[in-house]
Amino acid sequence: MTLNKMLFGGGVCAAALLAFSISAEAKRARCFTSDDGYFACTYRAIDDAGSFRISAPGYPTYVLEIDGPGFAYGYVNLGRRNVPLPGQFVRSHDDGACWYNPQTNTKLCAW
């Protein structure tokens, strides 16, 4: 293998690693929950399906795990453990950043 090919291959690997690490980083967002209203938060993608976690100092941490396209189950962490939220969340047709739980009439958004 020539030095140029080795350098090119190493550069491609480094770029792929950088792109992957950036996508997994937490991002600043504006959040809304029915219980807490609007607040500045941190958004972090959890997996490739679209599951995510939102958190902020002084607020509970919320996790939505995608169950299928447009459907998710939620958890809230109030300190030491995740507590399952009742019912299933449905992605909003009006705003794709929002999820609605028709069984509990609650809403969670992250922009």
Describe the function of each predicted region.
Residues 25-111:
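Cysteine-centric segments in proteins
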